[in-house]
């Protein structure tokens, strides 16, 4: 069942690094504010934990918007879904909720961004890829970003022995099983057993997407490095130096990769990996003008 987010006492158990964060509760979207005011509103040391009430569904009338540190031009909307990790049922629920929201609240320009990590850990990585290939929400521009798990899988399937070992220890065994590849299959035979269209999908993934003042990436960026000069390793795998930074990145970075019990909203970034595939939920952020709402499955 889809529900609005509420803070949990601890992060879901998962072999992935977690982080905690809080946001201030707002009752409705507000006009864009100057950056100093936004920073003050979102100062995590000065505001209480946000605990919205439970609801039965995430339809258009139930979206609960809060002030966002970023903005989109009027008439534009972006849906961004965090790390999926093989959770096909939850992804289908969010896509259905997005389709319903779009039907009830049309907008001039709508983009759906998936932030990567479609595979590993969860029960149906192959099903997730097939679902994404089928363009699950009609009428939207869809951007599929690469995650570190896709990068590792591609390297492993290309014959990188170290990557193959890493992959097997970080959920790759569940992905292989979803392709009906037995654990004792020689590694050199994996690639030939992966559906051709699935491999093409993995190879087609983008590293980033820009919209308004937002930069959508899988993991984050390297502080102190110009956005145009960021490297793939950081975009797919950075953690602490990015998460701990309070500097202005030149864009509000929307990312996954580091799991937390609920979305993390900071003056310079918004994290929406909430532990899907590892006991947590799958989160979708909805961006409009200078506001953001969250729905989960």
Question: What is the role of each PLM region?
Answer:
Residues 75, 107-109, 139-141, 212, ...:
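A general structural motif
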Residues 66-74, 103-105, 133-136, 207-210, ...:
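A short acidic-Thr-Gly-centered motif at the start of a beta-strand
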Residues 2-6, 10-93:
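Short glycine- and acidic-rich boundary segments immediately preceding or forming the N-terminal edge
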Residues 85-86, 120, 151, 221, ...:
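Short, glycine/acidic-enriched loop or turn micro-motifs at the edges of active sites
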Residues 56-67, 93-97, 126, 196, ...:
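Short, motif-level signal for alpha-helix interfacial/capping segments enriched in acidic residues
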Residues 166-271, 275-281, 287-297:
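Acidic, His/Gly-enriched loop-helix segments that form or flank divalent-metal centers
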Residues 87-165:
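Core catalytic region of metal-dependent phosphoesterases/phosphodiesterases
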Residues 81-82, 113-116, 143-148, 252-258, ...:
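Active-site neighborhood of phospho(di)ester-bond hydrolases with catalytic His/Asp-centered motifs
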